[in-house]
Amino acid sequence: MVTHSKFPAAGMSRPLDTSLRLKTFSSKSEYQLVVNAVRKLQESGFYWSAVTGGEANLLLSAEPAGTFLIRDSSDQRHFFTLSVKTQSGTKNLRIQCEGGSFSLQSDPRSTQPVPRFDCVLKLVHHYMPPPGAPSFPSPPTEPSSEVPEQPSAQPLPGSPPRRAYYIYSGGEKIPLVLSRPLSSNVATLQHLCRKTVNGHLDSYEKVTQLPGPIREFLDQYDAPL
């Protein structure tokens, strides 16, 4: 699914501008969910705010497949769009915000459950392959939803079967792989260290053992990407 943004161009991420928001919030909790998502996205360094679909295509045109960014959606029903460079060019996927969670928009005819997350960063991380895993799986033989979920053909030895996702666009079946975010600015050393620490904290007990100020700093951005 390809979208085209109607928002004004902007090369860098910037504070939330409510004048650009055409979609209304369904509740106070949804408003808070989106505000928190924007705050973390601005910390991420790969939130390009109001760049257009055409500008996203230009930004990703010279990048390898798997490079991605998050931008504001042009669709009045959605807040964010995931733009990703695939083996068949740049594709734009809307990020839905419903029922207090975010998910990638999928084919409504699909009976498969769509992964949902309380944070856009968690959604992005879910679709990224683990370290050492092959980037692009072989397409399944049976068609499914627009972003369907199928077992990977060759999981790593000793690891559970990976899930592979595919984009169905214009009759094409394209692997959805998020390998590397496209940075919109230079990350601080503190942020780089925080991402590294987040990637090594695999249990809540480890987090509770850290000093209070460090825990608070990590809570402000709790993703390894």
Swiss-Prot record:
Pfam families: SH2. Changing residue 30 to R: Partial loss of EPO-induced STAT5 signaling suppression. No effect on LIF-induced signaling suppression. Abolishes binding to JH1. Inhibits JAK2 phosphorylation. One of its GO terms (molecular function) is miRNA binding. Residues 22-33 are annotated as: Kinase inhibitory region (KIR). GO terms for cellular component: cytoplasmic side of plasma membrane; cytosol. Changing residue 25 to A: Complete loss of EPO-induced STAT5 signaling suppression. Abolishes binding to JH1. Keywords: Growth regulation, Pharmaceutical, Phosphoprotein, SH2 domain, Signal transduction inhibitor, Ubl conjugation pathway. Residues 34-45 are annotated as: Extended SH2 subdomain (ESS). This is Suppressor of cytokine signaling 3.
